[in-house]
């Protein structure tokens, strides 16, 4: 039985509005939905459970569906299923809704949860890029998620980017020393270096461990909506370790400090 969609945008709730907004922004601006493909699939799965979209899963694609859309970067098919709204009018309405979400304890806790998830995902995305740059398997980037779970430490997105860069560079150094390619050993070296870096970076023991992107605007719709509309973080989305204090501080005060 198909789920009954919410009646209005207000009934979506914060995560639902953010996820639907990311899908709409992605298709309107030709950006990826979320930092990683795994997170994108999770977002689309949540939207399907809410009855807002249809997807062909478990089949990869519909053979013939005139109403089907396709995400511009990930190439995932979907169909709009929410009869209460016209798709073209949703993106600005969802941005307005996200900006209006109150800063009560519940909403701040939701923002913090989403920020923490995005920080790790942005680190994983950068890790993928670094691994590909050195001709390693980009799927190794999922090891960052395991390191995060294991260590239980909070880093900023920029600090995760630094750790990913340093670990990949260590792996590249070992690979150059090998007479015969040994990808399994290189992966373990990278994993070990990633684990080794996290503690000193989180404690502030080392300096210059924050890699800010050249373009501070996130290249995924989910992170951009979070940084620019659900919060007032802006470029501090990358620089700050997720915390309630950072979310509650006025933007002007954060920039002054």
Predicted regions and their residues:
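Basic, alpha-helical nucleic-acid-binding regions used in initiation and control of genome expression
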Residues: 1-257
């Amino acid at each position: 039985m198909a789920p009954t969609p919410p009646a209005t945008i207000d009934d979506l709730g914060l995560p639902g509005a953010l996820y639907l907004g990311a899908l709409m922004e992605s298709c309107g601006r030709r950006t990826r939905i979320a930092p990683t493909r795994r997170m994108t699939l999770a977002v689309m799965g949540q939207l399907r459970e809410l009855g807002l979209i249809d997807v062909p899963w478990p089949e990869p694609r519909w053979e013939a569906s005139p109403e089907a859309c396709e995400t511009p970067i990930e190439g995932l098919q979907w169909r709009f299923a929410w009869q209460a709204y016209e798709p073209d009018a949703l993106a600005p309405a969802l941005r307005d809704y996200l900006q209006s979400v109150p800063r009560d304890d519940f909403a701040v806790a939701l923002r913090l949860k989403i920020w923490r998830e995005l920080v790790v995902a942005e680190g994983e995305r950068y890790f993928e890029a670094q691994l590909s740059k050195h001709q390693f398997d980009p799927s190794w980037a999922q090891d960052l998620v395991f390191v995060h779970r294991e260590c239980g430490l909070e880093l900023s997105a920029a600090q995760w980017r630094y750790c990913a860069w340093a670990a990949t560079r260590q792996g590249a150094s070992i690979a150059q020393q090998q007479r015969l390619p040994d990808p399994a050993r290189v992966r373990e070296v990278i994993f070990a270096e990633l684990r080794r870096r996290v503690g000193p970076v989180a404690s502030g023991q080392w300096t210059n461990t924050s890699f800010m992107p050249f373009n501070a605007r996130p290249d995924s719709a989910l992170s951009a909506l979070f940084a620019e509309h659900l919060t007032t973080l802006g470029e501090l989305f990358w620089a700050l370790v997720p915390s309630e204090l950072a979310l509650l501080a006025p933007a002007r005060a954060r920039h002054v400090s």
